[in-house]
Amino acid sequence: MIMNDTTKVYNFSAGPAMIPREVLCQVKRELYNWKNLKKSIMEISHRSQEFISVVQEIKHNLRKLLHIPNSYKIVFCHGGARGQFSAIPMNFSKNANHSSHNNVVDYINSGYWSYSAALEAKKYCYTNILNVCKTNNKKQYILPMNTWEINDNSLYLHYCPNETIDGIAIHEEPKFNDKKIVIGDFSSTILSKRINLERYSFIYASSQKNIGPSGITLIIMHESLLQNINSYVPSILNYKILVNSNSMFNTPNTFSLYLSGLILKWIKKIGGIKEIEKRNIIKSNMLYNMIDSTDFYINDVVSNNRSRMNVPFTIINTKLHEIFVKEAYKYGLHALKGHNLKGGIRASIYNAMPIKGVLKLINFMKIFEKKYG
């Protein structure tokens, strides 16, 4: 049994993901007495000036980190990304028969999550699903954006730039005409790299990967979209209501917002999104180089479409997968089991995963191959 170097634990979970240690230490210090108020942040009213200032600071830091133009609204809500799978078509479809051909939306299918969003949209719209993930020589790849057969009259286009299960990424940014409403599910890539928000009309992200703990959903949307929100949308999902109430239509997850605010400060402290992106490129390149250096480990995505956040791989002898996960756990490398739909092994290396955590995984992979290869 491999038992070396177990003093430090690294969490490779796809979500809830690892949180920076120094942020957790700050939470520990403040848990019982936040800002000398003699009570926890969890006990503070969401309508108090103290908590409103927390949310205002979060929005300010998001605007600075992501260079969000003033014409975009920032909203926090409930329900995760799956909640948005329903909310988006409900808010933006035409108030007509869902199968009507003047109620068309484009959904780019690149994997499980984008397809799940498309299936939900079919309940409300005529959904044009474009399959852009292909396979050649047992390697998955994404068709270039300029080959996507987009409907010129579609109400919007939805896509997911990073599929966490298969580890497939669309690194291109949208280059469609200015009138096209582009919606992106950034749940697993938000804050991990620089993006040109002006190429999107609406992006959203669940919080439990790069933003903070689970429990909130971030929406960044152009203010022009608020002009045509359907009135029949339930209030808790209605974007106009959420914007006008400053994300306080009902009680938000105050603790998750507080902790997310600390993580944004941590990102600023270490150098912002530019530094985060640099680290993420280093981490993912190191891990993929390890996989490609041997026939023992296999990744089935072409290099141009490999995810920087989620690195799935298999072992040439698939019977070793369970052994790998168990021995890695004893080595201090947790949550490496692949998704149930794909199997194998998956290392999710979000923002909070330090380079030394990936180095420790690589060292374990070398030891494991030497033992079982």
UniProtKB/Swiss-Prot annotation:
SUPFAM superfamilies: PLP-dependent transferases. GO terms for biological process: L-serine biosynthetic process; pyridoxine biosynthetic process. It comes from the Bacteria. Its cofactor is pyridoxal 5'-phosphate. It catalyses: O-phospho-L-serine + 2-oxoglutarate = 3-phosphooxypyruvate + L-glutamate; 4-(phosphooxy)-L-threonine + 2-oxoglutarate = (R)-3-hydroxy-2-oxo-4-phosphooxybutanoate + L-glutamate. Transmembrane segments: none annotated. The modification N6-(pyridoxal phosphate)lysine is found at residue 209. It is an enzyme of class 2 (transferase). Its EC number is 2.6.1.52. Binds 1 pyridoxal phosphate per subunit. Its main location: cytoplasm. It is found in: Cytoplasm. InterPro entries: Aminotrans_V_dom, Pser_aminoTfrase, PyrdxlP-dep_Trfase, PyrdxlP-dep_Trfase_major, PyrdxlP-dep_Trfase_small. Pathway: Amino-acid biosynthesis; L-serine biosynthesis; L-serine from 3-phospho-D-glycerate: step 2/3; Cofactor biosynthesis; pyridoxine 5'-phosphate biosynthesis; pyridoxine 5'-phosphate from D-erythrose 4-phosphate: step 3/5. L-glutamate binds at residue 47. Keywords: Amino-acid biosynthesis, Aminotransferase, Cytoplasm, Pyridoxal phosphate, Pyridoxine biosynthesis, Serine biosynthesis, Transferase. GO terms for cellular component: cytoplasm. GO terms for molecular function: O-phospho-L-serine:2-oxoglutarate aminotransferase activity; pyridoxal phosphate binding. PANTHER family: PHOSPHOSERINE AMINOTRANSFERASE. Homodimer. Belongs to the class-V pyridoxal-phosphate-dependent aminotransferase family. SerC subfamily. Catalyzes the reversible conversion of 3-phosphohydroxypyruvate to phosphoserine and of 3-hydroxy-2-oxo-4-phosphonooxybutanoate to phosphohydroxythreonine. This is Phosphoserine aminotransferase. It comes from Buchnera aphidicola subsp. Baizongia pistaciae (strain Bp). The gene is serC.
